[in-house]
């Protein structure tokens, strides 16, 4: 701590990302990264774009916005891109979520949301998930300025169907609904088709998970034009060039190679099903996930003890020391070999 810290900094509890190990040979199942590499076309596009590094990137990332728009069947002016979906979220809070009434989001969800609230001074209320760790739409019928949902939810992996999101929008025409769809490509239904009918919907997605571009940092939002304009106004008051030319080139190439994307996604979903079965056979309760991870707890072993024991044996999973979920482990769906090693170690421990 320094005497030069502002009052805001003194009260912050920053987000803590998953561990990035320095040593080789670790089975890394703690940060929900894609276990498979990006498309070779992505690597070729990045190499080709390197010669333009002396130039500033397009501040509007027009080529990328047009590619996303074509893929999602929306207009380019309905797309906002940023340096990962975390930056898109970071702009969303001051642009659209800071009002007199509180923002609502689940009590068990992406832990960056309360961090952004504290950083930007956004009043918020946490709405408890039900006993099955599900979001109940009826619980959001309370005074608020906006609703923020991660769908599929993190860290549970449980998803709301599109018609439930549509019902939420219909019940709240005067409140903004933000749907964070970082994991939507692994089996859930996207809310993007609802944007055309609801001016109070903003959908946020990322290239980090299903497109295997976590190291490139590309995210985007889709909404009707006034919402996108609000994000642009905040971005241009902060940094006019958030997405670099390599990221633009790589992300466009990732969209263009649909076959690679579909193959990777299919393999992850199949591995998730096997991992869920194997964990259940070891006595774990596994929540029904539509993400690239599973959320599980053992009936006789604490989550903290299991996470520590796994780490000692070279297997990293994510444990959250938080009420209601302290006995759960969030386990990324890795390759079949990685998941097999996890199960092998768990058999030894249990």
UniProtKB/Swiss-Prot annotation:
Name this protein carries in UniProt: Histidinol-phosphate aminotransferase 1
Keywords attached to this entry: Amino-acid biosynthesis, Aminotransferase, Histidine biosynthesis, Pyridoxal phosphate, Transferase
UniProt-recorded Gene Ontology molecular function terms: histidinol-phosphate transaminase activity; pyridoxal phosphate binding
Positions carrying N6-(pyridoxal phosphate)lysine: 209
Recorded catalytic activity of this chain's protein: L-histidinol phosphate + 2-oxoglutarate = 3-(imidazol-4-yl)-2-oxopropyl phosphate + L-glutamate
Pathway annotation from the record: Amino-acid biosynthesis; L-histidine biosynthesis; L-histidine from 5-phospho-alpha-D-ribose 1-diphosphate: step 7/9
EC number: 2.6.1.9
Top-rank lineage group of the source organism: Bacteria
Cofactors: pyridoxal 5'-phosphate
Record keyword RNA-binding present: no
Entries under PANTHER family matching the protein: HISTIDINOL-PHOSPHATE AMINOTRANSFERASE, HISTIDINOL-PHOSPHATE AMINOTRANSFERASE 2
One biological process term in Gene Ontology: L-histidine biosynthetic process
Pfam family, one: Aminotran_1_2
Recorded family membership: Belongs to the class-II pyridoxal-phosphate-dependent aminotransferase family. Histidinol-phosphate aminotransferase subfamily.
CDD domains, per database record: AAT_like
Originating organism: Bradyrhizobium diazoefficiens (strain JCM 10833 / BCRC 13528 / IAM 13628 / NBRC 14792 / USDA 110)
């Amino acid at each position: 701590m320094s005497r030069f810290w502002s009052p805001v900094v003194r009260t912050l509890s920053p987000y803590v990302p998953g561990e990035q190990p320095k040593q080789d040979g670790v089975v890394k199942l703690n940060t929900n990264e894609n276990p498979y590499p990006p498309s070779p076309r992505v690597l070729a596009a990045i190499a080709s774009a390197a010669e333009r590094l002396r130039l500033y990137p397009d501040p509007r990332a027009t080529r990328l916005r047009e590619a996303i728009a074509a893929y999602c069947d929306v207009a380019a002016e309905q797309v906002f891109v940023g340096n990962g979906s975390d930056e898109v979220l970071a702009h969303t809070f001051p642009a659209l979520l800071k009002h007199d009434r509180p923002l609502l989001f689940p009590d068990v969800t992406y832990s960056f949301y309360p961090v952004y609230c504290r950083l930007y001074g956004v009043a918020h209320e946490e709405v408890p998930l039900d006993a099955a760790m599900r979001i109940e739409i009826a619980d959001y019928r309370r005074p608020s300025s906006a609703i923020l949902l991660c769908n599929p939810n993190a860290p549970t992996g449980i998803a709301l169907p599109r018609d439930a999101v549509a019902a939420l929008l219909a019940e709240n025409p005067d409140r903004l609904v933000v749907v964070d769809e970082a994991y939507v490509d692994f089996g859930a239904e996207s809310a993007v088709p609802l944007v055309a009918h609801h001016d109070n919907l903003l959908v946020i997605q990322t290239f980090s998970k299903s497109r295997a571009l976590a190291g490139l940092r590309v995210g985007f939002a889709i909404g009707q034009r006034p919402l996108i304009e609000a994000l642009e106004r905040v971005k241009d008051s902060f940094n006019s060039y958030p997405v670099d030319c390599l990221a633009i080139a790589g992300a466009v190439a990732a969209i263009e190679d649909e076959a690679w994307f579909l193959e990777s996604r299919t393999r992850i979903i199949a591995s998730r099903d096997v991992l869920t079965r194997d964990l259940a056979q070891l006595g774990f309760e596994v929540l029904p996930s539509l993400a690239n991870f599973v959320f599980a707890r053992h009936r006789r072993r604490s989550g903290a003890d299991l996470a520590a024991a796994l780490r000692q044996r070279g297997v990293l999973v994510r444990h959250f020391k938080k009420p209601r979920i302290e006995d759960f482990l969030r386990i990324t769906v890795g390759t079949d070999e990685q998941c097999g090693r996890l199960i092998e170690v768990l058999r030894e421990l249990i």
